[in-house]
């Protein structure tokens, strides 16, 4: 059976654990004062991976909340992947040398494709490509801008450059609990022939069951945020759904 991983999300802004609605920095809900404590909680509930996002970093184009990511990576016996504000090789090395398992390159994939290709060649599977799309087109700079590049086009180009894993976020559904855009995630998996982790909109165990059905077609997991924070289901229940399929 194809693997399927649940990635609980810890989004950080101003040193706190927050969620944004559809990536809107003006629509923020604070869910905790300590991102590390939140990550610790998910690890205690059985998570194998934690997905951490530096929202300040994504907006400012530099590392801002990195100390929390590194503390979580060093302290917890789970894999940590991080995105947000990673623009240079120094950023990548800073995380990878301090215990982080994978770094996510997002905006750089549009603004500097040669750099991303070079990093893929150098660091291989430890680089994950984050493709965030609005109406099928790739969004950048903490979702504040939309490009004229289609998600599948960018995916194909980077798969050819060596990308093995993509995180696909449908901005329209992110933080809305309205159900994930499964079709768009599957299209990206088909276009690239690589693993795609679906992000945005997961609201119920049924959403996870639906995503799991595509595990054999390249959907390798789901990032779950707001549903866990608003008690739609527990991480234990989510893991049970995945393990029982």
Curated annotation (Swiss-Prot):
<comment type="pathway">
    <text>Amino-acid biosynthesis; L-histidine biosynthesis; L-histidine from 5-phospho-alpha-D-ribose 1-diphosphate: step 4/9.</text>
</comment>
<dbReference type="InterPro" id="IPR013785">
    <property type="entry name" value="Aldolase_TIM"/>
</dbReference>
<dbReference type="InterPro" id="IPR006063">
    <property type="entry name" value="HisA_bact_arch"/>
</dbReference>
<feature type="active site" description="Proton acceptor">
    <location>
        <position position="11"/>
    </location>
</feature>
<dbReference type="GO" id="GO:0003949">
    <property type="term" value="F:1-(5-phosphoribosyl)-5-[(5-phosphoribosylamino)methylideneamino]imidazole-4-carboxamide isomerase activity"/>
</dbReference>
<keyword id="KW-0028">Amino-acid biosynthesis</keyword>
<keyword id="KW-0413">Isomerase</keyword>
<dbReference type="Pfam" id="PF00977">
    <property type="entry name" value="His_biosynth"/>
</dbReference>
<feature type="active site" description="Proton donor">
    <location>
        <position position="132"/>
    </location>
</feature>
<dbReference type="InterPro" id="IPR006062">
    <property type="entry name" value="His_biosynth"/>
</dbReference>
<dbReference type="InterPro" id="IPR023016">
    <property type="entry name" value="Isoase_HisA-like_bact"/>
</dbReference>
<dbReference type="GO" id="GO:0005737">
    <property type="term" value="C:cytoplasm"/>
</dbReference>
<dbReference type="GO" id="GO:0000162">
    <property type="term" value="P:L-tryptophan biosynthetic process"/>
</dbReference>
<keyword id="KW-0368">Histidine biosynthesis</keyword>
<comment type="similarity">
    <text>Belongs to the HisA/HisF family.</text>
</comment>
<dbReference type="GO" id="GO:0000105">
    <property type="term" value="P:L-histidine biosynthetic process"/>
</dbReference>
<protein>
    <recommendedName>
        <fullName>1-(5-phosphoribosyl)-5-[(5-phosphoribosylamino)methylideneamino] imidazole-4-carboxamide isomerase</fullName>
        <ecNumber>5.3.1.16</ecNumber>
    </recommendedName>
</protein>
<dbReference type="InterPro" id="IPR011060">
    <property type="entry name" value="RibuloseP-bd_barrel"/>
</dbReference>
<keyword id="KW-0963">Cytoplasm</keyword>
<dbReference type="InterPro" id="IPR044524">
    <property type="entry name" value="Isoase_HisA-like"/>
</dbReference>
């Amino acid at each position: 059976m194809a693997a399927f991983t649940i990635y609980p999300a810890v989004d950080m802004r101003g040193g706190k654990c927050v969620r944004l609605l559809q990536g809107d920095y003006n629509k923020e809900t604070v869910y905790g004062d300590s991102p590390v404590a939140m990550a610790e909680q998910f690890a205690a509930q059985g998570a194998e991976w934690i997905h951490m996002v530096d929202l300040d970093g994504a907006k400012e184009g530099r590392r801002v909340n990195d100390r929390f990511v590194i503390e979580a990576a060093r302290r917890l016996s789970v894999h940590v992947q991080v995105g947000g504000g990673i623009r240079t090789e120094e950023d990548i090395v800073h995380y990878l040398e301090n215990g982080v398992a994978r770094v996510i390159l997002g905006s750089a994939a549009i603004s500097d494709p040669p750099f991303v290709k070079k990093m893929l060649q150098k660091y291989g599977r430890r680089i994950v490509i984050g493709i965030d799309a609005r109406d099928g087109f790739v969004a950048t700079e903490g979702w504040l801008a939309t490009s004229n590049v289609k998600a599948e086009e960018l995916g194909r180009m980077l798969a050819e450059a060596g990308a093995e894993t993509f995180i696909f976020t449908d901005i329209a559904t992110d933080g809305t609990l309205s159900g994930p855009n499964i079709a768009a995630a599957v299209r990206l998996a088909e276009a690239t022939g690589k693993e795609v982790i679906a992000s945005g909109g997961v609201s119920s165990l049924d959403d996870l069951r639906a995503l799991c059905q595509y595990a054999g077609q390249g959907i390798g997991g789901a990032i779950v945020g707001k549903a866990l924070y608003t008690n739609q289901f527990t991480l234990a229940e989510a893991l049970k759904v995945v393990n029982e399929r």
